Amino acid sequence: MRLLTSRATRVPSPSGLLCAVLAMLLLTPSGPLASASPIEAAEAAVVRELRCMCLTTTPGIHPKMISDLQVIPAGPQCSKAEVIATLKNGKEVCLDPKAPLIKKIVQKMLDSGKKKN
C-alpha cells in the first residue's frame, strides 16, 4: 500500500532543512558589503582582525616619506609588535620594529608627541 500519490509533494525532513539553512549561512558573505556608506566603512576599518597585520616587513624607509606611524603592541591577535607607517602617497608599509633605523624613527615620533602635550 502506497501512502503518497504521484502528485503529492514531499516536505523536507528537519535534518535536510537544517543542512539547507547551514549551507545558506556558509555562502552568505560575512564582511561589510560594497554598498556600505563611507561612515560604515570607516567604522569597519577601526576594528582590527584577530591576526597579524604585517606578513612582511621593510627594514628601512626615509622618515620624510612617513605621514603617520602606528605601533601595535604584541597581544592575543599577534605575538609580535607591529609598526605600520602610512606614507605621504597614502600607501601603508609594515616596518621591522627590531631594525635600528625604525627604533630611532619610533622614538623620535614619541618624543615629538610628548613635546606637543
From Swiss-Prot:
Gene3D superfamilies: 2.40.50.40
A cellular component annotation (GO) from this entry: extracellular space
SUPFAM superfamilies assigned to the protein according to its UniProt record, in alphabetical order: Interleukin 8-like chemokines
Alphabetized GO MF terms: chemokine activity; CXCR chemokine receptor binding
Keyword Disulfide bond found: yes
Matches recorded under Pfam families: IL8
Entries under InterPro entries matching the protein: Chemokine_b/g/d, Chemokine_CXC, Chemokine_CXC_CS, Chemokine_IL8-like_dom, CXC_Chemokine_domain, Interleukin_8-like_sf
Secretion signal, residue range per the UniProt entry: 1-36
Cystine connections: C52-C78, C54-C94
Induction or repression: By lipopolysaccharide (LPS).
Tagged with keyword ATP-binding: no
Keywords, sorted A to Z: Chemotaxis, Cytokine, Disulfide bond, Inflammatory response, Secreted, Signal
Tissue specificity annotation: Alveolar macrophages.
Localization annotation: Secreted
PROSITE patterns: SMALL_CYTOKINES_CXC (PS00471)
GO biological-process terms attached to the record: antimicrobial humoral immune response mediated by antimicrobial peptide; cellular response to lipopolysaccharide; inflammatory response; neutrophil activation; neutrophil chemotaxis
Subcellular location, principal: secreted
Role played: Has chemotactic activity for porcine, and in a lesser extent, for human neutrophils.
Family membership: Belongs to the intercrine alpha (chemokine CxC) family.
Protein name: Alveolar macrophage chemotactic factor 2
Species name: Sus scrofa (Pig)
